[in-house]
């Protein structure tokens, strides 16, 4: 299937041709390799220039910068890009190429003095792709991650997608629908580890962490247990063991995205527990692996009678989560939908977004 490069096509800046632009760096590694490749492609497209060895551009680290931040300085045909990490350097490279295009100037005339730091540590996209290849609420074709319960490995397209994400600072992605069912429940098993390892090889060098949406009832559906009660020590052990297995096979995985107690799916409420009980149990399981739990707040009773005007479904998430503010583990992020209900013609911002102060 054909695909576009979006804003990374690097069209020629007319009248600004130059034969070569040189680069020097002592940095090594896969992310730096991606940065060099981006510069080479960008300069070839914008100026028709080859990327050679020299000191026109210097890539370096400055650990005083934000870990994902960068500093870009350019004048008189020379440019320095410093990052707080290799990913910061990559972000600086994308910033240079972006600024060159908006300036529309010859390389020797280009000037820049820019320093950026991340204001949000997690900048994630959630795909609602199903493993049969369909996309829930999808609007532009089928999934390029899944088909017929298998993981697709389209390296050129996935690489182009990872580039696009990195170019705008996206650093996390879940590839499967948060409504986890059927084959998707098995993504955390050896049935799919091999293919997911290929995804890690593609996304990780671009600073994009791979996350998986999981089934809260996995101890029952995968492990044959009678319960998924988050306060049951046997359930907690099952998840701790599963986390060790997953990260042993998928080192560098970002973590899990969880939708529980919503639209008929089981969760902590099924067992008389609260949302922090569920999120914290999983957080403790993945913490030794450096994992992160993203816990959705779109929780309500889907069997409520919409004709009962005394029931205010829109406040359900607020009522459930506000009393728990400050009780979640540090490796838990609560994911709040912009509005408290689906499919509204106009939608107020969820009061949870401004209400939670310690989570």
Over which residues does each language-model region extend?
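Feature activates predominantly on carbohydrate-active enzymes
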Residues: 2, 6-11, 28, 32-38, ...
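Catalytic-core regions of glycoside hydrolase
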Residues: 151, 227-359
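Structural motif
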Residues: 24-29, 59-63, 82-84, 129, ...
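Long, low-complexity intrinsically disordered regulatory regions in eukaryotic proteins
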Residues: 4, 11-23
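Short acidic low-complexity segments
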Residues: 46-62
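A mature extracytoplasmic/lumenal domain signature
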Residues: 61, 131, 177-179, 262, ...
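Charged, often glycine-rich, active-site loop that binds/positions anionic groups
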Residues: 61-69, 308-315
């Amino acid at each position: 299937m054909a695909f576009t490069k979006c804003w990374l096509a690097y069209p020629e800046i007319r009248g600004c041709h130059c034969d070569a632009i040189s680069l020097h760096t002592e940095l090594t590694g896969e992310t730096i390799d991606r940065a060099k490749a981006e510069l080479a492609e960008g300069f070839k497209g914008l100026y028709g220039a080859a990327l050679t060895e020299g000191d026109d551009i210097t890539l370096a680290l400055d650990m005083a910068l934000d870990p994902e931040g960068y500093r870009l300085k350019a004048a008189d045909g020379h440019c320095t890009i410093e990052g707080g990490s290799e990913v910061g350097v990559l972000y600086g490279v994308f910033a240079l190429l972006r600024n060159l295009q908006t300036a529309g100037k010859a390389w020797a005339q280009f000037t820049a003095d820019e320093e950026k730091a991340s204001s949000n540590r997690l900048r994630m996209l959630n795909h609602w792709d199903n493993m049969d290849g369909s996309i829930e609420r999808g609007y532009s074709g089928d999934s390029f991650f899944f088909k017929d319960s298998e993981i697709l490995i389209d390296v050129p397209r996935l690489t182009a997608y990872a580039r696009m994400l990195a170019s705008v600072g996206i650093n996390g992605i879940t590839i499967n629908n948060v409504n986890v069912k059927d084959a998707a429940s098995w993504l955390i098993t050896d049935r799919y580890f091999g293919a997911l390892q290929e995804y890690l090889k593609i996304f990780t060098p671009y600073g994009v962490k791979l996350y998986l949406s999981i089934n809260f009832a996995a101890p029952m559906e995968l492990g044959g247990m009678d319960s998924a009660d988050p306060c049951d020590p046997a359930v907690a052990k099952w998840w701790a063991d599963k986390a060790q297995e997953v990260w042993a096979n998928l080192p560098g995985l970002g973590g899990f995205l969880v939708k529980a107690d919503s639209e008929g799916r089981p969760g902590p409420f099924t067992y008389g527990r609260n949302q922090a009980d569920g999120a914290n149990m999983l957080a403790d399981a993945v913490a030794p692996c450096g994992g992160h739990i993203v816990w959705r707040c779109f929780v309500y009773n889907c069997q409520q009678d919409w004709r009962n005007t005394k029931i205010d479904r829109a406040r359900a998430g607020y009522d459930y989560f506000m009393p728990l503010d400050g009780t979640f583990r540090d490796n838990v992020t609560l994911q709040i939908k912009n509005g408290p209900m689906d499919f509204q013609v106009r939608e107020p911002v969820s009061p949870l977004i401004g209400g939670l102060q310690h989570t």
